[in-house]
Amino acid sequence: MSVAVLAFGLNHTSAPVSVRERVSMPVDLVKPALEGLRATFGGAVREAAILSTCNRTELYCAAEGQVAEHLPAWLAEHNRLEAAALRPHLYRHQHDDAVRHAFRVASGLDSMVLGEPQILGQMKDAVRAANEAGALGTLLHQLFQRTFSVAKEVRSQTAIGAHSVSMAATAVRLAERVFGQLEDARTLFIGAGEMIELCATHFAAQRPRSMVVANRTIERAETLAGRFSAQTMKLADLTERLAEFDVIVSCTASSLPILGLGMVERATRQRRHRPMVMIDLAVPRDIEPEVGRLDDVYLYSVDDLGRLVQSGTDARRAAVVQAEAIIETRVQGFMHWMQSREVVPVIRDLHQAADDVRAAELERARRMLARGESPEAVLEQLAHGLTQKYLHGPLAALNRSEGDERRQLLAWVPRLFPGRDSRR
């Protein structure tokens, strides 16, 4: 059965964070998930990769056609969810649509922040994880290599990433809405990954009163804090120290909330109801959503920031048209490569058949020479034998055919045997 490229999953436009966090896969769970996927479908899934970020969880597969119908059930079962509840949020792309989707994702056209560059690195990490899991083959390897090339071309030839309003910059603006200038604000960053580093960079530019980094691994917190002359603290100290901070930005890989309603409620009482801005960029969420109901807390999720970011994308809309044109050209190029792969086995078989004929006729010629026959007669017989053997198949097909089939075969003769006019 033929193998098709398939892209399947959900993202920030198809599913709210409450759904995305339930199918999000930390890096250490990607390999077991790929193994489970291939074990479930056996040889029907030839190759696979999983891209899981705050804004999307997607599967890219080289698979037989019937696999697509069963992927929603697999994803639901893998995450212990009801398929009926998950299905409305899922999308599926096949063939050139799947290739187009991969190119758009890597180029930042499908991102919550139009043109944001982080997604390309995240996709490269996903490909690396799939390769380490032994789940990549020729087709997906070629797809992703072309995907990275297209993303680079789009960014170098268009203004898609120019003046990008980042999530980190938006987080600063939200804090400024509540506190005005941030010179007196005490800021806490929970986590030490790329997003926290970006946020810390933007907040540091506003010269807040203090910056503290809390992380499960204190060494990573110290490395990040050292860049901004910030302090560090242990996650275990959050309960006692949370009330100190005016702005909290959190983005960890925790599968469970770090800040619960009770903890934050106690902190607001200790602060005598001075406001707190809490920005949760994690998926799954680090802060229980019920915290947003507290009068003195301004809680923003990654989806809230995404909606605010969209207002800053108008200046880049013109670049989208140019980017889409580049992508469309490259999609057609990839599909041509895929189609050319289909004839490779046929070409290989033709070469083998021709080589078998050559070897047989050559051996016959050697025997004739060994019997003392003249070289001229041997060459004549060799040429005649090769001609007869090579033409036997086409001539037999023509003789057996009739009607439309014969007309089609006759039309192909000049293309298969160029240099001679067809005589009918």
Curated annotation (Swiss-Prot):
Residue positions of the active site: 54 (nucleophile)
Pfam family, any one: Shikimate_DH
Enzyme Commission numbers on file: 1.2.1.70
PROSITE patterns: GLUTR
Function recorded in the entry: Catalyzes the NADPH-dependent reduction of glutamyl-tRNA(Glu) to glutamate 1-semialdehyde (GSA).
Reactions catalysed according to its record: (S)-4-amino-5-oxopentanoate + tRNA(Glu) + NADP(+) = L-glutamyl-tRNA(Glu) + NADPH + H(+)
GO molecular function, one term: glutamyl-tRNA reductase activity
Entry keyword annotation includes Coiled coil: no
Gene symbol of the encoding locus: hemA
Positions contributing to substrate binding: 53-56, 111, 116-118, 122
Subunit record text: Homodimer.
Keywords, comma-separated and alphabetical: NADP, Oxidoreductase, Porphyrin biosynthesis
Protein known as: Glutamyl-tRNA reductase
Further details from the record: During catalysis, the active site Cys acts as a nucleophile attacking the alpha-carbonyl group of tRNA-bound glutamate with the formation of a thioester intermediate between enzyme and glutamate, and the concomitant release of tRNA(Glu). The thioester intermediate is finally reduced by direct hydride transfer from NADPH, to form the product GSA.
Pathway it works in: Porphyrin-containing compound metabolism; protoporphyrin-IX biosynthesis; 5-aminolevulinate from L-glutamyl-tRNA(Glu): step 1/2
Residue spans crossing the bilayer: none
Annotated site location: Important for activity: 101
Residues the entry annotates as binding NADP(+): 191-196
Comment block on domains: Possesses an unusual extended V-shaped dimeric structure with each monomer consisting of three distinct domains arranged along a curved 'spinal' alpha-helix. The N-terminal catalytic domain specifically recognizes the glutamate moiety of the substrate. The second domain is the NADPH-binding domain, and the third C-terminal domain is responsible for dimerization.
NCBIfam families reported for this sequence: hemA (TIGR01035)
Annotated GO biological process: protoporphyrinogen IX biosynthetic process from glutamate
Family recorded in the similarity comment: Belongs to the glutamyl-tRNA reductase family.
